[in-house]
A protein has these predicted regions:
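Alpha/beta hydrolase fold serine-hydrolase catalytic domain that processes acyl esters and thioesters
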Residues: 179, 183, 192-194
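The feature captures the ABC ATPase H-loop/switch
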Residues: 137
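Active-site-proximal beta-strand elements of phosphoester/diester hydrolases
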Residues: 229-233
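Paired acidic/hydrophobic, glycine-rich loop segments that form the ligand-binding mouth/hinge
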Residues: 191-192, 209
Length: 258
């Protein structure tokens, strides 16, 4: 790849909906110097043409993949700067505009699971940089033999809540020596949260790179030279935070360096 070539980054999502996440992720990749192409179960593309992969957020990973039966989950809220509110309002409006397509009639998406697990294995085998966002981080973990908590409400005791918000209302601690901490440049990070599940047992070769104070895993990475990162939050919805955009910059840089 020449210095002027823009690496091609595949971004996964559902067949119906997910347009706000796709547009924000594509924008982040473009700002980082790459090109983005959307991948779905109906349009899987050619993995060999990709220089890097983002496994996006969305519906829950089917617990069949880690040997469990489905449970049911719940939700909640939480508080924030003028810039945060402005960006959050714009992103929320985008998501609302596309929401009529985002209502999935099923809790799981087996065809998407199949495509994304194939792409994860391809990236790991081919040494391509891989970033998992929310569901994507969970699926990377499951693909490598890990498990999930289908509900994380028990982590939030009386007087606390699990704020589900595009705004950065959670604080996570970044593990010393982790790639994630180096990228974000601090010991802690403020992040958003749209998830009701989280990683439980780690998959092969993965380590925890971020946690909430209550122990909920918020970031994972694979040891070694290959870039394999997973974050439980949505950095694509935080374009106003430069440290969060470094995740996409590092992905594009690693794709270019292959």
């Amino acid at each position: 790849m020449t210095p002027d070539t823009k690496p091609l980054i595949g971004v996964t999502g559902p067949v119906n909906g997910g347009l706000a996440a796709w547009l924000m992720t594509a924008l982040a990749i473009r700002r980082a110097g790459g090109r983005a192409c959307r991948l779905t179960a109906e349009r899987p593309g050619d993995a060999d043409q990709l220089d890097g992969i983002v496994i996006g957020g969305g519906t829950d990973v089917d617990p069949f993949h880690y040997g469990e039966e489905p449970l049911q989950a719940d939700a909640d809220r939480g508080r924030t700067s003028i810039l945060d509110w402005t960006v959050g309002l714009l992103v929320s409006a985008m998501r609302a505009v596309f929401a009529r397509h985002d209502r999935e009639t099923q809790n799981f998406d087996p065809e998407r699971d199949k495509l994304e697990q194939t792409l994860i294995r391809h990236a790991l085998y081919a040494g391509k940089p891989l970033l998992g966002i929310c569901r994507g981080a969970q699926l990377i973990n499951v693909t490598l033999g890990g498990t999930l908590y289908q509900s994380i409400e028990h982590f939030y005791q009386e007087g606390t809540s699990n704020p589900r918000s595009i705004l950065p209302r959670k604080t996570v601690a970044l593990a010393p020596g982790s790639r994630l901490r180096t990228l974000l440049g601090s010991e802690h990070a403020r992040v958003n949260a749209l998830h009701e599940q989280s990683i439980r047992d780690l998959g092969d070769g993965l380590v925890v790179s971020a946690r909430e104070e209550n122990g909920v895993i918020q970031g994972i990475e694979r040891q070694g030279s290959q870039l394999v990162l997973g974050v439980q939050w949505h950095p694509e919805y935080l374009p106003q935070y430069r440290p969060q955009q470094r995740l996409f910059q590092q992905l594009v840089h690693a794709a270019k360096a292959r």
